[in-house]
């Protein structure tokens, strides 16, 4: 289904370039498609200088115009709460302290580094952890800036894993993308290259380009971390994009963010993860929403996340259950969270809660040692 765009020829609809060139970016444009709520209209007006708005025709087509609480709509259309100081005072622009001495480079964990290579996004998601960069304009890192990042990685031989993010890293020109990957592959201690991309969700047409896939395959091993938040985002186009990546030997993992009003429902999450497994995408993380200024209204309680994790157990295969994690403030790293299944302990005896809620006694006898 191509809601709103039924008259667009299929060859154009399948064009990534057409999707980007025809993004809806103004109040006047979006009102052609949606009857905006007062808080949305005011939100678009008041966020433009701070948190700009843009949405691809493809992602817009997934919105049910009759539902003001549509989960795609909530992720893509600004609301005035984003600039409500009373609400957003609990957040920080850079709560995870990503900014360092080298622009765009974050070296938090000893063996891996994050490269933010562009501020451009196909869609400016309203819950984005990097909303602070929205107002910087749409620009990619220059080759000189990339070279500075590469030199840093060369000097730090403990780095074996490079995560390329943004903005949207796979929006880079093919020429610049190949330059970046070729420079990284010159470094012998770099073993893994990952992309954090939401294009399979927002503009899956990007992966209908064989030249892009040729480049990614050429510099294998490449891993894709994508970001489906709701089952409505898994369409035939998204499935085709994932399939094209997998056929090139590029694994695809998913990192979902727990968002109030979007997916803070156990049944919604179960449906999402089941659909991801069906298209061969592994649910890797369920992230608790970060305290980012401009996105605080999307946060739920930790108890809600634990409730969802408890619900998934017994209803979903183990490899389909993501790790629920909190990103600690100040760049202190991720902490995994699990419901407490140990209800009681006495010496070597434990009482565990099963997935059905039954409490079962379990005794650990002496461990034999040779």
UniProtKB/Swiss-Prot annotation:
Record keywords, A-Z: 4Fe-4S, Iron, Iron-sulfur, Isomerase, Metal-binding, Pyridoxal phosphate, S-adenosyl-L-methionine
CDD domains linked to this entry: Radical_SAM
EC code(s) of this entry: 5.4.3.-
Location of the Radical SAM core domain: 107-322
Superkingdom of origin organism: Bacteria
Secretion signal, residue range per the UniProt entry: none
GO molecular function: 4 iron, 4 sulfur cluster binding; intramolecular aminotransferase activity; metal ion binding
Co-factor remark: Binds 1 [4Fe-4S] cluster. The cluster is coordinated with 3 cysteines and an exchangeable S-adenosyl-L-methionine.
N6-(pyridoxal phosphate)lysine modified-residue sites: 334
The protein's required cofactors: [4Fe-4S] cluster; pyridoxal 5'-phosphate
Class of enzymatic activity (EC top level): isomerase
Record PROSITE patterns: RADICAL_SAM (PS51918)
InterPro entries: Aldolase_TIM, LAM_C_dom, Lys_aminomutase/Glu_NH3_mut, rSAM
Binding site for [4Fe-4S] cluster: 121, 125, 128
Family: Belongs to the radical SAM superfamily. KamA family.
PANTHER family registered for this protein in UniProt: L-LYSINE 2,3-AMINOMUTASE (PTHR30538:SF1), LYSINE 2,3-AMINOMUTASE-RELATED (PTHR30538)
Name assigned to this protein: Putative L-lysine 2,3-aminomutase aq_454
């Amino acid at each position: 289904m191509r809601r709103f765009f039924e008259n667009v020829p299929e060859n154009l609809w399948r064009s990534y370039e057409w999707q980007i060139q025809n993004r809806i970016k103004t109040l006047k444009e979006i009102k052609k498609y949606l009857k905006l709520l007062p808080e949305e209209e005011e939100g678009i007006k008041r966020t433009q200088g701070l948190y700009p708005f843009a949405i691809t025709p493809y992602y817009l087509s997934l919105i049910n115009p009759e539902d003001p609480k549509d989960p795609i709509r909530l992720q893509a259309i600004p609301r005035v709460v984003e600039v409500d100081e009373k609400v957003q005072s609990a957040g920080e622009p850079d709560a995870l302290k990503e900014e360092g001495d080298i622009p765009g480079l974050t070296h938090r964990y000893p063996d891996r580094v994050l490269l933010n290579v562009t501020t451009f996004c196909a869609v400016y998601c309203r819950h984005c952890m990097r909303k602070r960069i929205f107002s910087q304009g749409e620009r990619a890192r220059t080759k000189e800036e990339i070279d500075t990042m590469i030199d840093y990685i060369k000097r730090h031989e403990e780095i074996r894993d490079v995560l390329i993010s943004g903005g949207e890293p796979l929006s880079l020109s093919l020429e610049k993308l190949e330059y970046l990957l070729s420079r990284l592959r010159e470094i012998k201690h770099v073993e893994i290259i990952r992309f954090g991309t939401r294009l399979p969700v927002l503009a899956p047409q990007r992966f209908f380009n064989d030249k892009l896939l040729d480049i990614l395959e050429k510099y294998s091993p490449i891993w894709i971390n994508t970001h489906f938040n709701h089952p409505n985002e898994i369409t035939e186009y998204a499935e085709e994009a994932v399939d094209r990546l997998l056929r090139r030997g590029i694994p695809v993992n998913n990192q979902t963010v727990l968002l109030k009003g979007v997916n803070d429902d156990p049944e919604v999450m179960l449906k999402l993860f089941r659909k991801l497994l069906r298209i061969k995408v592994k649910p890797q993380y369920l992230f608790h929403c970060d305290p980012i200024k401009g996105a605080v209204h999307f946060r739920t309680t930790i108890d809600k996340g634990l409730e969802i994790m408890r619900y998934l157990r017994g209803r979903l295969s183990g490899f389909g259950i993501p790790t629920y994690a909190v990103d600690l403030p100040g760049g202190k790293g991720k902490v995994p969270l699990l419901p407490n299944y140990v209800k009681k302990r006495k010496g070597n005896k434990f009482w565990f809660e099963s997935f059905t809620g039954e409490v079962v006694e379990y005794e650990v006898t002496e461990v034999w040692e040779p």
